[in-house]
From Swiss-Prot:
<feature type="transmembrane region" description="Helical">
    <location>
        <begin position="90"/>
        <end position="110"/>
    </location>
</feature>
<feature type="topological domain" description="Periplasmic">
    <location>
        <begin position="42"/>
        <end position="47"/>
    </location>
</feature>
<dbReference type="GO" id="GO:0005385">
    <property type="term" value="F:zinc ion transmembrane transporter activity"/>
</dbReference>
<feature type="topological domain" description="Cytoplasmic">
    <location>
        <begin position="1"/>
        <end position="20"/>
    </location>
</feature>
<protein>
    <recommendedName>
        <fullName>Zinc transporter ZitB</fullName>
    </recommendedName>
</protein>
<keyword id="KW-1133">Transmembrane helix</keyword>
<feature type="transmembrane region" description="Helical">
    <location>
        <begin position="122"/>
        <end position="142"/>
    </location>
</feature>
<feature type="topological domain" description="Cytoplasmic">
    <location>
        <begin position="203"/>
        <end position="313"/>
    </location>
</feature>
<dbReference type="InterPro" id="IPR036837">
    <property type="entry name" value="Cation_efflux_CTD_sf"/>
</dbReference>
<dbReference type="Pfam" id="PF01545">
    <property type="entry name" value="Cation_efflux"/>
</dbReference>
<keyword id="KW-0813">Transport</keyword>
<dbReference type="InterPro" id="IPR002524">
    <property type="entry name" value="Cation_efflux"/>
</dbReference>
<feature type="topological domain" description="Cytoplasmic">
    <location>
        <begin position="69"/>
        <end position="89"/>
    </location>
</feature>
<feature type="transmembrane region" description="Helical">
    <location>
        <begin position="182"/>
        <end position="202"/>
    </location>
</feature>
<keyword id="KW-0997">Cell inner membrane</keyword>
<feature type="transmembrane region" description="Helical">
    <location>
        <begin position="21"/>
        <end position="41"/>
    </location>
</feature>
<keyword id="KW-0472">Membrane</keyword>
Amino acid sequence: MAHSHSHTSSHLPEDNNARRLLYAFGVTAGFMLVEVVGGFLSGSLALLADAGHMLTDTAALLFALLAVQFSRRPPTIRHTFGWLRLTTLAAFVNAIALVVITILIVWEAIERFRTPRPVEGGMMMAIAVAGLLANILSFWLLHHGSEEKNLNVRAAALHVLGDLLGSVGAIIAALIIIWTGWTPADPILSILVSLLVLRSAWRLLKDSVNELLEGAPVSLDIAELKRRMCREIPEVRNVHHVHVWMVGEKPVMTLHVQVIPPHDHDALLDQIQHYLMDHYQIEHTTIQMEYQPCHRPDCHLNEGVSGHSHHHH
């Protein structure tokens, strides 16, 4: 049997990605503060709800920026994977904060149905339009230019695109108030925008908890991966003890592979590593090659479960 380890590295244009993220973060964070101040001055709850939605974008951009920065830090003896998991922890805290903010906004909206308050429609309209333009600018900053963007930049662009709906909601509420003076439009739209925030927060919470619990990437079908390896690599007879987890946005894998004793061990190992890289974008793999079938009870234990503890035979 043999135990081998591979860690290939890819070089993305990190400075370009960091610059995009920094500019978009500045625009989004700045207009989020404008919406918070404008929401209090105009009395508009829809603007405050949209500011909450913009907070999800600001946080997504910040985490993406931190991921780019922390990915440059080399691992240490104490932190052998570096500091990438820190962004996941921050995302988890942010998701909980967003849920709390959303509950407070919905509670305030219900109170406003009972006791309506005046809303300054003109100011609300001006700030909502400015917020919409800020979102468009942020999306353009993230999306234009080089096509080689990392996953964080793409995810941040989708966050900003989703926030356009929140700004449109605030504009609709402002138009209704200006034309009809019907102020309940404001809490109604604020609840609708809050549902968008809650959806983003729930997705963020689910993804961050999955990563903190060292769950496998949602997009990866481990059973299918094992079948394909046995089918497409002639020397591979069986794949077991497969464990996959995420560190930042990078998947890490350990696995045991039963193989036909090869004429060239290193060539077969290299073939398996390249197969996982090319088909599943897994750069960091630890492969234990075995020449005898594994008949122990734990050979197929926890096959659907991700983690990085595994037994050596």
